[in-house]
Design a protein with these regions (language model features):
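Hydrophobic/aromatic beta-strand patches that form the interior of the parallel beta-sheet core
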Residues: 258, 333-335, 353-355
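Phosphate/adenylate-binding glycine loop and adjacent helical scaffold
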Residues: 338
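Single conserved hydrophobic/aromatic residue that forms the stacking wall/gate
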Residues: 399-408
């Protein structure tokens, strides 16, 4: 799924680079799924082409609500994406209804491995009498009666009963995604914490984050100043040296690069100071404020935890202000790994746009930039090792504790 998404965005960027996005985007679904090609899990090639068409929407910063007439060509949407002054979408993620397979909401099914045994453990243990029997003695489930308790699944000695999940719903920790009356999944923004699990779980790649790639690229094409503030976890994203990765950002057209790890140093110091103050006031503990997905979880599902969340800004918050001070007339673009940061960027006036590492990889491919061949770019003020440690599990806790020293 990631490969498909990467390729599609790279193809769009390639058209943009050659000033052919509006002119040739309508041919893209046909080129990706020629008449004699084998559909990728779809029933026929025309369905596959329709899926390609609608998957371009979120990659251009649009969603399904932007389509008011199905006969409107993609070129019109491409023109809209390139001409808008600012991103105007309130939602962070969207479901491509044409790509959603409307997974059947049946959690348990008895397979033909059923031996029609005498013990009939499934029948004897079912609390709702939902087990029926065929003429050949094999069991079957009456889904109108079944409550999906799973007791039959556990009791079958032959493991002939299988659990069939709806992958996106199964992966969501807060039950923010569910089907509408047409069987298509929808994300409830009032519940969603933007963890991105549903996007990774969907086997059909029907869930997308709404990209700002072309907003960023258009500013670059206009010759405007853009500063990339890059999360330290980029060290594990590409195979070349970090200096070559930074050089690639210069090749794309960024004016300067600032490590978010610089902001992490300030977060560590300020959060340690805040922790000591809270403990002195009698508060028993304090939780981090660095993860926007966690912040959403607290605000929407664990409101009793609000008093314990740190008020210290995240590394991105401080890095953006460092960038603004150094380049007051530039647009600030946060570059990071996760969906949830899109929500934090919306809240932070100092950050203008966001790109994920995946989008950066597609931009590099689309612009034919080879990481191994670019000139290295070194940052004058590199951050200390501890600041880069924020990217590892438990890094925030470890280095905040170290900053507080033996006072806690």
């Amino acid at each position: 799924i990631m490969i498909v998404r990467h390729k599609l965005l790279a193809d769009l960027v390639r058209l943009w680079k050659n000033d052919e996005l509006v002119e040739k985007i309508d041919r893209l679904p046909i080129e990706l799924s020629p008449r004699k090609s084998k559909p990728l899990g779809r029933c026929f090639v025309h369905k596959e082409r329709a899926v390609w068409r609608y998957k371009t929407f979120p990659l251009m910063g649009l969603d399904m609500t932007d389509e008011h007439d199905e006969v409107t060509p993609l070129s019109e949407y491409a023109r809209l994406a390139l001409s808008r002054p600012e991103p105007d979408k309130e939602n962070i993620m969207c479901v491509i209804d044409e790509a959603c397979s409307s997974c059947v909401q049946i959690n348990y099914e008895i397979t033909n491995l059923c031996r029609g045994c005498v013990a009939r453990s499934c029948y004897m243990n079912c609390p709702k009498d939902a087990i029926r029997f065929k003429k050949n003695g094999q069991a079957m489930i009456d889904h109108d009666t079944c409550v999906s308790c799973g007791i039959c699944h556990k009791s079958c000695p032959y493991h002939a009963i299988v659990y069939i999940p709806v992958p996106c719903e199964e992966s969501c920790p807060v039950k923010a995604i569910s089907k509408d009356e047409h069987g298509v999944e929808h994300i409830d923004e009032s519940k969603c914490i933007y963890c991105g699990k549903c996007m990774n779980a969907c086997p059909f790649g029907a869930i997308f984050e709404i990209s700002q790639t072309f907003d960023v690229l258009q500013h670059i094409k206009k010759g405007e100043k853009l500063v990339a503030i890059i999360a330290p976890s980029i060290l594990g994203q590409f195979k070349t040296s970090i200096e070559q990765v930074y050089g690639a950002f210069k090749e794309i057209g960024f004016t300067d690069i600032i490590e978010v790890a610089e902001g992490a140093m300030m977060t560590t110091s300020n959060e340690a100071h805040e922790l000591l103050e809270k403990l002195e006031e009698g508060q028993k503990f304090m939780t981090t404020s660095c993860c926007p997905s966690y912040i959403e979880l607290v605000e929407k599902h664990m409101t009793e935890m609000k008093p314990y969340v740190s008020t210290t800004g995240s590394p991105m918050y401080y890095a953006a202000r460092i960038a603004k001070e150094k380049h007051p007339d530039a647009k600030i673009v946060f570059v990071g790994p996760c969906v949830a940061k899109r929500k934090e960027v919306r809240r932070d006036d100092a950050v203008d746009y966001i790109l994920t590492f995946e989008e950066v990889g597609s931009i590099l491919d689309g612009m034919d930039i080879q990481l191994e061949q670019v000139n290295s770019f070194s940052i004058l003020h590199t951050s200390v090792r501890e600041a880069h440690g924020f990217a590892q599990a438990g890094g925030c806790l470890l280095y905040t504790s170290d900053a507080a020293d033996d006072r806690i």
